[in-house]
């Protein structure tokens, strides 16, 4: 199985100790986001690869070597150009860029992916602003990654517009920026969650597929079992896996975030608990995780049971 850590919160930034403890212990419990009393039991020896996603890996660096030695790992690193009006708790961008380089050197250029995600437009954050920042940041990072993934902010959630009152849904801004990205050749640019909406018009922009069979096969020089469906939403080409983490627990406070309207759950955090946030209740029902296998049997890399003794 592929373990995604996580689409719902920032585990490397805030909950890395918990994940390290649980994987070494041999199992963890993941609540159903629609029913917290239903939990999946995820066992470490079933994990074939881990896909991390974070805005700040600095607190996680002490665990990177262990994870990278024992699992096939992909690291998505989100670095965007916004100030405190949009990302109030993600301020030290220069230090984060240096950490991106450190993480790349500790793993490999192939394993780390830069996410310039999401792109939003306001009177302040125009296409010209994004072009300037993309140019600066891509020149900084192109020696440490091959890929930049981007998307445009989703406005289907009403609180996003409420949090960013001057948000502009401007086709001209978007078109100008897409033309600029399409002209760049220092990185491979591809979208997230947009399918081939832009790649059909801009041939140098790749189809949405942040964690694909092609990526895993190229990075780890392996063959994957043929995958049928399992994509997370329309326009998503990611390989099916198990997503851990819980909503309303990320402390970055980003105004565009769909996963954290508040942070009250963070107070329930216990790094020694089998559940990221909260406690196991007497009436909880635990089911085995049924995520599909990804790698062909002879090519799987995973811990043996003896590693947990």
Regions found by a protein language model. Name each.
Residues 1-76, 80-86, 100-104, 263-309:
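Conserved Radical SAM active-site core
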Residues 1-4, 43, 204-247, 285-297:
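N-terminal [4Fe-4S]-dependent radical SAM core
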Residues 8-10, 55-57, 78-82, 117-121, ...:
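Active-site beta-loop-alpha junctions enriched in small/polar residues
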Residues 82-90, 118-128, 162-172:
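Surface-exposed cleft-lining segments at the edges of enzyme active sites
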Residues 95-160, 180-194:
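Conserved C-terminal portion of the radical SAM core fold
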Residues 164-223, 275:
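Flexible, acidic/Gly-rich N-terminal and inter-domain linker regions that tether
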Residues 242-262:
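Local cysteine-cluster metal-coordination motifs and their immediate loop/turn environment
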């Amino acid at each position: 199985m592929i373990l995604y850590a996580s689409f719902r919160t920032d585990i490397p930034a805030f909950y890395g100790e918990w994940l390290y403890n649980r994987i070494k212990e041999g199992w963890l419990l993941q609540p159903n986001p629609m029913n917290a009393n239903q939990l999946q039991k995820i066992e470490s020896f079933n994990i074939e690869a881990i896909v991390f996603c974070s805005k700040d890996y600095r607190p996680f660096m002490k665990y990177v070597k262990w994870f990278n030695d024992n699992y096939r790992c992909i690291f998505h690193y989100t670095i965007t150009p916004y100030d405190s009006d949009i990302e109030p708790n993600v301020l030290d961008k220069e230090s984060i860029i240096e950490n991106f380089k450190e993480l790349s050197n500790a793993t490999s250029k192939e394993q780390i992916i830069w996410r310039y995600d999401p792109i939003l437009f306001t009177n302040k954050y125009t296409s010209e602003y994004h072009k300037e920042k993309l140019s600066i940041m891509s020149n900084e990072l192109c020696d440490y990654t091959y890929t930049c993934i981007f998307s445009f902010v989703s406005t289907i959630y009403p609180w996003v517009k409420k949090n960013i009152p001057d948000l502009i849904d401007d086709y001209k801004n978007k078109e100008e920026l897409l033309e600029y990205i399409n002209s760049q050749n220092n990185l491979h640019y591809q979208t997230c969650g947009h399918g081939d909406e832009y790649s059909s018009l801009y041939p140098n922009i790749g189809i949405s597929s942040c964690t694909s069979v092609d990526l895993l096969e190229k990075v780890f020089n392996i063959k994957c079992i043929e995958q049928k469906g399992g994509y997370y939403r329309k326009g998503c080409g990611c390989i099916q896996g198990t997503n851990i983490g819980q909503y309303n627990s990320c402390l970055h406070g980003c105004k565009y975030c769909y996963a954290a309207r508040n942070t009250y759950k963070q107070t329930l955090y216990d790094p020694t608990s089998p559940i990221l946030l909260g406690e196991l209740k007497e009436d909880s029902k635990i089911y085995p995780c049924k995520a599909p296998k990804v790698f062909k049997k002879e090519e799987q890399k995973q811990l043996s049971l003896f590693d947990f003794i």
